[in-house]
């Protein structure tokens, strides 16, 4: 994988460019792809954003999100564009396997493939150009860097600002996670100077749910959370019945994993949702507990040092027991 700065001089020549992200995209994935979209179209490129799956409805406020193709719904149209694309940008994931049904198509394409991502252990052999930086707060911050370092800061408009700010806010936990370095605040300051209304974006992300989601949250915290004080760990589980009862949609469980971290002494949180095909895990930690290694070792996943995800084909009951056994095996790291 060659350094991404080699692309800077090639930006001015119009091309056909596809941009994609990981499945079930969050604010950083959707924000970074749409932010890059609004940058590239200013050069006259033909640009198409493709999501491997559907996304949370609370992301529908983002400028031009209505132009994003859901691969599961528009496979033929998406494939046609991908097969004729000159460039493919892959944002907020570093292995094609994170794109579900889209993965085989991405792997077989012969176009120039470009990675912009901040997760650990990238598959660098799959990309022509790229930048991978685990020290960055978000992929949105990296897209901002890409634009500025390419010499085109003047092309950052309000659409780009809103998209990139959304991803930074989400991935830094509203600027409270350890990934919030000085560079993040410098970026936000520059976006504010361009006219960004940060409260508008924050409200769109966090004050945009339905009543059922708040009642669901109350149910989960009251009835589905177990605190294991001797291991400084909390686990939350969501059953299929819970999802049906409260009519939970894509994105409605976002952020719930963070709530137990407010309990004094908690160093690790495990959050599992019982889906039809598998059990989906999310992990959050404080201090020196490595969620990425934990997720890879026990649940075939990965991510960041203090935030990662995984999956399990076992039943909900069995996967919870597996988690409890895993934390016992790592108890010295949780003291």
Model-derived features: positions:
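A structured phosphate/pyrophosphate-recognition subdomain
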Residues: 2-25, 35-41, 123-268, 274-278, ...
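Primary mode marks residue(s) on the alpha4-beta5-alpha5 output face of response regulator receiver
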Residues: 281-284
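Short, glycine/polar-rich helix-capping loops at beta-to-alpha or helix-loop-helix junctions
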Residues: 54-58, 118-123, 290-295
């Amino acid at each position: 994988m060659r350094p991404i700065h080699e692309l800077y001089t090639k930006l001015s020549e119009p091309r056909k460019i596809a941009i994609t992200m990981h499945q079930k995209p969050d604010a950083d994935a959707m924000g970074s792809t749409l932010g890059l979209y609004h940058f590239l179209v200013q050069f006259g490129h033909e640009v198409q954003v493709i999501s491997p799956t559907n996304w949370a409805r609370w992301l529908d406020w983002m400028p031009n999100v209505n132009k994003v193709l859901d691969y599961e719904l528009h496979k033929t149209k998406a494939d046609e564009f991908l097969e004729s694309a000159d460039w493919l940008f892959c944002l907020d994931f570093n292995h094609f396997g994170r794109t579900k049904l889209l993965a085989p198509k991405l792997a077989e394409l012969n176009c120039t493939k470009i990675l912009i991502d901040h997760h650990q252990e990238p598959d660098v052999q799959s990309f022509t150009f790229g930048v991978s930086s685990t020290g960055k707060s978000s992929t949105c911050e990296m897209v901002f860097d890409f634009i500025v370092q390419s010499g085109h800061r003047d092309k950052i408009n309000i659409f780009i600002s809103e998209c990139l700010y959304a991803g930074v806010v989400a991935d830094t936990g509203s600027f409270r996670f350890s990934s919030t370095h000085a560079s993040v605040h410098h970026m936000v300051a520059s976006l504010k100077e361009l006219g960004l209304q940060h409260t508008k974006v924050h409200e769109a992300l966090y004050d945009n749910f339905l009543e059922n989601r708040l009642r669901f949250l109350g149910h989960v915290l009251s009835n589905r959370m177990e605190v294991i004080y001797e291991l400084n760990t909390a686990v939350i589980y969501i059953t299929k019945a819970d999802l049906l009862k409260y009519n939970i949609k894509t994105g409605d469980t976002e952020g719930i994993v963070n709530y137990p971290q407010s309990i004094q002494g908690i160093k690790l949180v495990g959050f599992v949702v019982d889906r039809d095909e598998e059990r989906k895990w999310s992990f959050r930690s404080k201090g020196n507990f490595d969620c990425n290694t934990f997720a890879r070792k026990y649940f075939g996943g990965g991510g960041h040092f203090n935030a990662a995800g995984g999956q399990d084909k076992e039943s909900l009951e069995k996967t919870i027991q597996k988690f409890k056994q895993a934390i016992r095996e790592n108890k010295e790291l949780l003291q």
